[in-house]
Swiss-Prot record:
CDD domains: crotonase-like (cd06558). InterPro entries: ClpP/crotonase-like_dom_sf, Enoyl-CoA_hyd/isom_CS, Enoyl-CoA_hydra/iso, Enoyl-CoA_hydra_C. Belongs to the enoyl-CoA hydratase/isomerase family. Pfam families: ECH_1. 3-(methylsulfanyl)acryloyl-CoA binds at K31, R32, A69, L71, L73, G118, R144, G149. It catalyses: 3-(methylsulfanyl)acryloyl-CoA + 2 H2O = methanethiol + acetaldehyde + CO2 + CoA; 3-(methylsulfanyl)acryloyl-CoA + H2O = 3-hydroxy-3-(methylsulfanyl)propanoyl-CoA; 3-hydroxy-3-(methylsulfanyl)propanoyl-CoA = 3-oxopropanoyl-CoA + methanethiol; 3-oxopropanoyl-CoA + H2O = 3-oxopropanoate + CoA + H(+). This is Methylthioacryloyl-CoA hydratase. Involved in the assimilation of dimethylsulphoniopropionate (DMSP), an important compound in the fixation of carbon in marine phytoplankton, by catalyzing both the hydration and the hydrolysis of 3-(methylthio)acryloyl-CoA (MTA-CoA) to acetaldehyde, CO2, MeSH, and CoA. The keyword Ribonucleoprotein does not apply. GO terms for biological process: fatty acid beta-oxidation; protein hexamerization. It comes from Ruegeria pomeroyi (strain ATCC 700808 / DSM 15171 / DSS-3). NCBIfam families: PRK08150.1. SUPFAM superfamilies: ClpP/crotonase.
Length: 267
């Protein structure tokens, strides 16, 4: 199973652990893990099948000192693409990131260094984001004479608000530290390693039931795009399926018998 999941990749380094946590590392450190066409194709391939191949959670990180510096601008410049060609490049980015957000496998992004342009768009498709003290966020497209093409107008806008996102693109404004976390660019900020914290979260999440995680990571995103009435109906429908699965009944029985772990306040 592990061989099927992790083989055949050049720009991604994959490590599937025994508990179903798969570490996915962007492996272009000399380019600050910039996203070229080949890397996007590998992201599409991996996230298209991860949920069917025993992956229970993903920790997404980057090799070297940076998470991801965004679109490979040198490749884009050398390709001298037509408008039609680049539109289809953007659509492929959307396919990769939609498979991440809606694929049903929880993704925790371990961020450090540059989370810039398309790198921020990539991070925004993860369900949880953990930043360390070196992490900085930017959307420098305005200064480069280009426009976003990987979902910043949707996901980054949802995270921090439309006008903050516009400010980042227009002015190149950089966010980092506690301010970035407070704005919603990351849910966790660590003094130490963002990877270690992401792994801690992934280990905990991987112990959840797969169908429950699938509903949390897929159904909620779909419901956000529905009217309130439709979302309420969908929530009831999904809840009916998830809350009556046999494995859930086993966990409820443990709760009823007082053998399940209790929810306690943070110490």
């Amino acid at each position: 199973m592990t061989q099927d999941v992790t083989s055949g990749y050049s720009n991604l380094d994959l490590d599937l652990r025994d508990n179903g946590v798969c570490v996915v590392t962007l492996n272009r450190p000399d380019k600050r893990n910039a996203l070229d066409v080949a890397t996007i194709e590998e992201l599409v391939t991996f996230f298209s099948t991860a949920h069917r191949k025993g992956v229970r959670a993903v920790v997404l990180t980057g090799a070297g000192d940076h998470f991801c510096a965004g679109l490979d601008l040198v490749e884009h410049w050398k390709a001298d693409r037509s408008a039609d060609d680049f539109m289809h490049v953007c659509l492929r980015w959307h396919e990769a990131f939609n498979k991440m957000e809606y694929g049903g496998v929880p993704i925790i992004a371990a961020l450090r260094g540059a989370v810039v342009g398309g790198g921020l768009e990539l991070a925004s498709a993860a369900h949880l984001r953990v930043m360390d003290q070196s992490t900085y966020f930017a959307l420098p497209e305005g200064q480069r004479g280009i426009f976003t093409g990987g979902g910043a107008t949707i996901r980054v806008s949802d995270m921090i608000g439309k006008y903050r996102m516009i400010d980042m693109i227009l002015t190149g404004r950089v966010y980092q530290g506690q301010e970035a976390a407070d704005l919603g660019l990351a849910q966790y900020i660590t003094e130490g390693s963002s990877f270690d914290k992401a792994m801690e979260l992934a280990d905990k999440i991987a112990s959840n039931l797969p169908l429950t995680n699938f509903a949390i990571c897929s159904a909620i995103s779909h419901m956000q795009n529905m009217s309130g009435l439709d979302a309420a109906y969908a929530e009831a429908f999904v809840g009916g399926i998830v809350n009556t699965q046999p494995a859930a009944r086993e966990r409820l029985e443990a709760f009823a018998n007082k053998t399940a772990a209790r929810v306690r306040p943070n110490s």
